[in-house]
A protein has these predicted regions:
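Oxidizing extracytosolic/periplasmic lumen-facing domains
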Residues: 1-69
Length: 69
């Protein structure tokens, strides 16, 4: 797991964030990825606003593959 930061978010008509773009750094390399949020994550959409810190899980063999946890 690693720390990341939300850099962009897409909201639905009700204002719930449904998709995020985030960045994280591993071994000096910066990665950027996007993910659709689960229903549970959407219920806490204030936690996924741009600028918020997040925790991501990544594949150690392919660190560009990650998910928001």
């Amino acid at each position: 797991m690693a720390d990341g930061r939300i850099i962009d978010a897409i909201s639905d008509n009700d204002g719930h964030i449904t998709q995020v773009t985030y960045t994280y750094v591993l071994a000096g390399v910066q990665y950027e990825s996007s993910q659709a949020l689960s229903d549970l994550q959407q219920a806490r959409s204030h936690d996924y606003a741009p600028g918020k810190q997040i925790v991501i899980r990544y594949d150690p063999r392919r660190p560009a593959n990650s998910i928001v946890v």
